[in-house]
Protein backbone atom coordinates (compact mmCIF):
# COMPACT_ATOMS: atom_id res chain seq x y z
CA UNK A 1 0.00 0.00 0.00
CA UNK A 2 2.81 2.44 0.87
CA UNK A 3 4.41 1.95 -2.56
CA UNK A 4 1.11 2.72 -4.29
CA UNK A 5 0.63 5.84 -2.21
CA UNK A 6 4.16 7.01 -2.98
CA UNK A 7 3.50 6.50 -6.69
CA UNK A 8 0.25 8.45 -6.39
CA UNK A 9 2.12 11.30 -4.70
CA UNK A 10 4.78 11.23 -7.43
CA UNK A 11 2.03 11.43 -10.07
CA UNK A 12 0.97 14.76 -8.59
CA UNK A 13 4.27 16.16 -9.85
CA UNK A 14 3.26 15.39 -13.44
CA UNK A 15 -0.48 16.00 -13.42
CA UNK A 16 -2.68 18.96 -12.66
CA UNK A 17 -5.16 17.95 -9.97
CA UNK A 18 -7.78 20.18 -8.37
CA UNK A 19 -6.93 21.37 -4.84
CA UNK A 20 -10.13 19.85 -3.44
CA UNK A 21 -9.17 16.40 -4.73
CA UNK A 22 -5.60 16.71 -3.42
CA UNK A 23 -6.86 17.80 0.00
CA UNK A 24 -9.46 15.01 0.12
CA UNK A 25 -6.82 12.40 -0.72
CA UNK A 26 -4.31 13.62 1.86
CA UNK A 27 -7.00 14.15 4.51
CA UNK A 28 -7.65 10.44 4.24
CA UNK A 29 -4.06 9.30 3.59
CA UNK A 30 -1.42 11.61 5.13
CA UNK A 31 1.51 12.36 2.79
CA UNK A 32 4.41 9.90 2.79
CA UNK A 33 6.74 12.11 0.72
CA UNK A 34 7.82 15.70 1.12
CA UNK A 35 6.67 16.68 -2.40
CA UNK A 36 3.27 15.23 -1.47
CA UNK A 37 3.25 17.24 1.76
CA UNK A 38 4.09 20.40 -0.18
CA UNK A 39 1.26 19.82 -2.67
CA UNK A 40 -1.09 19.16 0.25
CA UNK A 41 -0.10 22.48 1.85
CA UNK A 42 -0.78 24.38 -1.37
CA UNK A 43 -4.14 22.63 -1.79
CA UNK A 44 -5.11 23.48 1.80
CA UNK A 45 -4.14 27.11 1.24
CA UNK A 46 -6.16 27.27 -1.99
CA UNK A 47 -9.16 26.02 -0.03
CA UNK A 48 -8.55 28.52 2.77
CA UNK A 49 -8.06 25.85 5.42
CA UNK A 50 -6.35 26.84 8.65
CA UNK A 51 -3.85 23.97 8.76
CA UNK A 52 -2.21 25.09 5.50
CA UNK A 53 0.53 27.01 7.32
CA UNK A 54 1.46 24.16 9.65
CA UNK A 55 1.60 21.62 6.81
CA UNK A 56 3.45 24.14 4.63
CA UNK A 57 6.08 24.81 7.28
CA UNK A 58 6.64 21.05 7.72
CA UNK A 59 7.03 20.67 3.94
CA UNK A 60 9.43 23.61 3.76
CA UNK A 61 11.59 22.10 6.48
CA UNK A 62 11.29 18.64 4.90
CA UNK A 63 13.52 19.21 1.89
CA UNK A 64 13.20 18.74 -1.87
CA UNK A 65 10.07 19.36 -3.88
CA UNK A 66 9.14 20.38 -7.41
CA UNK A 67 10.68 23.77 -8.31
CA UNK A 68 7.30 25.33 -9.14
CA UNK A 69 5.81 24.07 -5.88
CA UNK A 70 8.88 25.36 -4.03
CA UNK A 71 8.38 28.87 -5.44
CA UNK A 72 4.65 28.83 -4.66
CA UNK A 73 5.19 27.58 -1.14
CA UNK A 74 7.89 30.15 -0.42
CA UNK A 75 5.67 32.96 -1.72
CA UNK A 76 2.88 31.78 0.53
CA UNK A 77 4.94 31.14 3.66
CA UNK A 78 7.59 33.88 3.48
CA UNK A 79 5.94 36.06 6.16
CA UNK A 80 5.82 33.26 8.74
CA UNK A 81 9.04 31.32 8.09
CA UNK A 82 11.64 31.68 10.82
CA UNK A 83 15.43 31.54 10.38
CA UNK A 84 15.50 28.05 11.90
CA UNK A 85 12.95 26.92 9.27
CA UNK A 86 15.35 27.99 6.51
CA UNK A 87 18.32 26.29 8.19
CA UNK A 88 16.29 23.10 8.65
CA UNK A 89 15.31 23.16 4.97
CA UNK A 90 18.94 23.63 3.91
CA UNK A 91 20.04 20.70 6.07
CA UNK A 92 17.32 18.48 4.55
CA UNK A 93 18.25 19.55 1.01
CA UNK A 94 21.90 18.71 1.61
CA UNK A 95 21.02 15.31 3.07
CA UNK A 96 19.01 14.67 -0.11
CA UNK A 97 21.90 15.92 -2.31
CA UNK A 98 19.52 18.45 -3.89
CA UNK A 99 22.28 20.82 -5.00
CA UNK A 100 20.23 23.16 -7.21
CA UNK A 101 17.57 23.79 -4.56
CA UNK A 102 20.26 24.12 -1.89
CA UNK A 103 22.01 26.82 -3.94
CA UNK A 104 18.76 28.82 -3.99
CA UNK A 105 18.23 28.18 -0.29
CA UNK A 106 21.61 29.74 0.60
CA UNK A 107 19.96 33.16 0.34
CA UNK A 108 17.85 32.41 3.41
CA UNK A 109 20.16 30.58 5.83
CA UNK A 110 21.43 32.19 9.00
CA UNK A 111 24.89 33.78 8.97
CA UNK A 112 26.05 31.42 11.74
CA UNK A 113 25.25 28.35 9.65
CA UNK A 114 26.30 29.68 6.23
CA UNK A 115 29.95 28.52 6.25
CA UNK A 116 29.04 24.96 7.18
CA UNK A 117 26.28 24.86 4.58
CA UNK A 118 28.62 26.23 1.90
CA UNK A 119 31.13 23.50 2.71
CA UNK A 120 28.45 20.82 2.48
CA UNK A 121 27.05 22.27 -0.74
CA UNK A 122 30.51 22.06 -2.29
CA UNK A 123 30.67 18.40 -1.29
CA UNK A 124 27.21 17.72 -2.75
CA UNK A 125 28.38 19.29 -6.00
CA UNK A 126 31.48 17.05 -6.05
CA UNK A 127 34.00 19.67 -4.94
CA UNK A 128 36.10 19.29 -1.82
CA UNK A 129 36.40 22.74 -0.23
CA UNK A 130 39.24 21.53 2.03
CA UNK A 131 41.27 20.39 -1.00
CA UNK A 132 40.75 23.82 -2.53
CA UNK A 133 42.30 25.42 0.55
CA UNK A 134 39.08 27.02 1.78
CA UNK A 135 38.80 27.41 5.56
CA UNK A 136 36.57 24.78 7.17
CA UNK A 137 34.41 25.41 10.23
CA UNK A 138 35.99 23.44 13.08
CA UNK A 139 32.71 22.08 14.44
CA UNK A 140 31.94 20.08 11.30
CA UNK A 141 33.88 16.95 12.34
CA UNK A 142 31.10 16.07 14.78
CA UNK A 143 28.19 17.08 12.53
CA UNK A 144 26.48 14.08 10.91
CA UNK A 145 25.33 16.07 7.86
CA UNK A 146 28.87 17.14 7.02
CA UNK A 147 30.27 13.66 7.62
CA UNK A 148 27.57 12.15 5.41
CA UNK A 149 28.16 14.62 2.56
CA UNK A 150 31.95 14.34 2.79
CA UNK A 151 32.02 10.53 3.02
CA UNK A 152 29.60 10.29 0.09
CA UNK A 153 31.66 12.68 -2.04
CA UNK A 154 34.87 10.79 -1.23
CA UNK A 155 33.32 7.38 -1.92
CA UNK A 156 31.69 8.40 -5.21
CA UNK A 157 34.93 9.99 -6.41
CA UNK A 158 36.93 6.80 -5.82
CA UNK A 159 38.49 7.83 -2.50
CA UNK A 160 36.98 5.06 -0.41
CA UNK A 161 40.03 4.65 1.86
CA UNK A 162 39.86 8.34 2.77
CA UNK A 163 36.11 8.07 3.40
CA UNK A 164 36.65 5.04 5.64
CA UNK A 165 39.40 6.84 7.58
CA UNK A 166 37.16 9.89 8.02
CA UNK A 167 34.32 7.82 9.44
CA UNK A 168 36.58 5.60 11.56
CA UNK A 169 38.45 8.49 13.18
CA UNK A 170 35.58 10.89 13.78
CA UNK A 171 34.72 12.12 17.28
CA UNK A 172 31.26 11.34 18.69
CA UNK A 173 28.39 13.02 16.85
CA UNK A 174 26.91 16.14 18.42
CA UNK A 175 23.39 15.29 17.21
CA UNK A 176 21.42 12.50 15.62
CA UNK A 177 21.54 12.24 11.83
CA UNK A 178 18.59 13.99 10.18
CA UNK A 179 18.14 11.03 7.84
CA UNK A 180 19.16 7.85 9.68
CA UNK A 181 18.49 5.67 6.62
CA UNK A 182 20.87 7.65 4.43
CA UNK A 183 23.44 7.80 7.24
CA UNK A 184 23.43 4.02 7.75
CA UNK A 185 23.36 3.37 4.00
CA UNK A 186 26.46 5.54 3.53
CA UNK A 187 28.30 3.89 6.41
CA UNK A 188 27.53 0.49 4.90
CA UNK A 189 28.48 1.58 1.37
CA UNK A 190 31.86 2.86 2.55
CA UNK A 191 32.46 -0.26 4.65
CA UNK A 192 31.57 -2.60 1.78
CA UNK A 193 33.76 -0.77 -0.71
CA UNK A 194 36.65 -0.61 1.73
CA UNK A 195 36.24 -4.32 2.52
CA UNK A 196 36.17 -5.21 -1.18
CA UNK A 197 39.48 -3.42 -1.69
CA UNK A 198 41.29 -5.12 1.19
Task: Name each model feature, range by range.
Residues 1-198:
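Alpha-helical solenoid repeat scaffolds
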Amino acid sequence: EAKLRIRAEQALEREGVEPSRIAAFFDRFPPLTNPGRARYALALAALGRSEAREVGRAAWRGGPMNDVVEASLLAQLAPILLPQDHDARMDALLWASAGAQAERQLLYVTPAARAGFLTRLGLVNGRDPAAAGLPQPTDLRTAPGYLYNRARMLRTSGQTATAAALLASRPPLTERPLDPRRWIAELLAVARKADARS
